[in-house]
Each structure stands twice: as structure tokens, then as C-alpha cells.
Amino acid sequence: MSNKTNNFPVHIFPKVVSDYINEYTVNNSFDPNYMSSAFISLVSTLIGGNYRAEVCKEWKEPPIIWNAIVGNSGDKKSPSVGLILKPLDDLNAELHRQYQAAYDEATDDEERRLIRAKQIVVGDITYESLIQVLNNNPFVLLNVDELLTLFSDGNRLSKNIDSLLSIFNQRPISLNRKTDSEKKLIRNPSLGLIGGFQHKLLDKFIGNGRMESGFVMRFLFTLRSEVRHKLIIKDANPKIVDDYTDFIAKLLTVQQYNTEIKDIPLNVEALEVFNDWRNINREVRDELKCGEMNEYLSKIEGYIPRLAIVVEMVDRVNNNDEIKIISKYAVERAIDLTAYYVANFEHLLKGSKIILGDANKKRSCVADLMKSLTPKVRKRTVKTLYDKGHSKVTISHSLGIPASTLNDQLSSERKNKGK
């Protein structure tokens, strides 16, 4: 399966990050799409237990991101992700060293029992162990090579999908042990998730009720980039690597333990752009006949504040500034990201036998909210939105229509109206 027209919008990143991704893409054939989504996971991990995006007093979104890295065997899914997440792995190792040192210095069992094991990344894990980790840490990233291992018969996480969905929404979860009276309650659980699966295993991933439960709909899907460079093995430019390492070091200072969650509001301009997009999204969903795509567009709405706070934090750290609000710039970049991920989801739907069934069965879905609409419907929708007062910038970002194309269409309509 190919995805020739949809590459990750790397323009959302500061130059220090995009240069690093490009350096390893050109010199060692790592995948820029996989690396870019992994960077989103990295940042969300560092801020997940400390910040939330505040749309309004009643609507707050935690920066919890679930990423599915999709490709074929040999596409460098895990190496590309691992290259970006290495700073988290290094931090994880240092946290374990500190824990072990404190444990060894403890003088009795009671003192040892009170020592909390700090972790920021976990791999294959049982549900009970996950609860313990979340109890000790404000945010954890579950990083697995193969997402399907989470749903194997021997993995108890597969039997706790409802609890995982609660974690995604940062709702309280608890664990009652049958062996004793101990009860653990996690009030603000934060669990990021990143892992891969092969295209040929798509139907296994979305099967067994995981699509119907909404579990699959919480994922952002990343497909392999179609950009190809000459195959070479070459050490990366040391300056580019050092600059990126320094930037990550600044990001690492954002992650804190034992702090209250800070709610970061969208400013007036950001909220206006977000509401414009929501209205456009609703009108596009009304045009759809594909139930799965309609539901995904509904779920993706909550991802815009989540992605926006990630973008805002990266921008603030890059400018050596403190995050206080979520800007219009961040929301527009988040809209760019959701357009990318929505297009990937549609691409996957087209390859699913479970969803599409008979090859002759036609279903109407969309790519980045508009691609599958007929030209006539597309033009009518653009005109309707513009007449309702939506800005050209918002329409362009939300519908994936180039600004030049949008301007040409509206200019043509004005000329025709004047005749």
C-alpha cells in the first residue's frame, strides 16, 4: 500500500528538529514520517502529567497521544521511532539508577517500601503493573514494537480496554486486589502509547470489537513516507546532532514530578480558529456516508487541543519562553496535523476487508476532510463557509485546499456575480 501524496507536515517543527529529522532521512534512510510522529509522542510524554489544554472551563484536554506506526517489514518503523525516543530511554535509565541507589541505601523493609520507582517509558506490561507505574509517575509512555502484542491472549491489557479508554480521557481508574484489601486509585492517569503494526495485519488490529468500542478511533496513524533518497550510510552532521541534543535537554526540564496540573487556555484568536474548524468539520461530516470516517472525524476534534499544546510547548521552549496560552499559530498547526492523520486513517480504511467488505461495495469517505467530495459539492461547501463568515485561512487549513486555489475560486465567483 502506498501513500504518495501524504507526508508529515514538518513545517510545524522548529528548524533544529526538522534539520535533525532530515539529516537522518538523507544519510541513513530513516523514515521522516515515523520520526516526526515519534517526536510528537516525546513532547507529549514530557508535558502529559503537568499540563492540559483548556478550551473552556468545562472542556480540558490532556496531551495524551496514541500513535500507531504503520508499514511493512523492513520499513525501519522501530529504528526511526527509537532514534527520536532515545532521550527518554536515557532518562529512564538514569531514573532507574537513582531508584536502585536509594533502594540499596535503605536500612529496612519499610523504608524500601516507601521508595517510588520513577519511570517515563515502559514496554510490555501487565495491567496491574501499569497501575503501579501510573501511581508513581505523572506520565508514562508505553512503547511497544508491535501493537498487536497488547491484544494477545496472554496479555491482560487486552481485557482492560475500557480502563485504557478512561486513561486516554484522563479519568480516574482503580485497581482492587482480590488477595488483600488494598485499593489503588489514580485520579489523573496519563499514558501515551506508541507502537507499530504491519499493513497485512490491519484487520487483526481493528478486529475483535476494537473499532466498535472506539479504541481504534483514539489512534493517530502514521504511514511510511514515499520520499526516497539514495541509500548511503554516513555519520550525521555533529553540529545538527548537538543542536538537537541541546534542544531536547531544554525540553527535558519541562517534565516535573509532584506538581499540580496547569491548565493552559486557548486565547481568543485560537478559540475562534478552533470553532471555525469544528463548524466546518460538522458540515463535512453531514456530507459523509462512511460511518467509520464520520466517527473518526468526531473523535479527532479532541486531538486538536492536545496537539496544539504540544506545538505551543515546542515553540515556547525553542524561544526560551514560558507557556502561558495556546496561540492561534499552535491551533492552525494542530489542524494541519489532524488533516495529515485523517488522510492516513482513510487510506487504511480503504485497505480493510472488515470495513469495506465486498470490493464492489462503494463507500464515500474523505481524506483531509474534503478530497472525496465531488468538485461541485466542494465548491458549494467553500462558498457556504465563506458566506457564513469563516476566514480564508481557516477554510484553507481545515479543508486542505491550497490558499491559491481558494482565492481563485472565490475571485471567480465574485466576477460571475458581478456580471
Kindly give the residue locations of the regions a language model identified.
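Phosphate-handling catalytic cores of nucleic-acid transaction enzymes
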Residues: M1-K376, R380-K383, K388-S398, P402-N407, ...
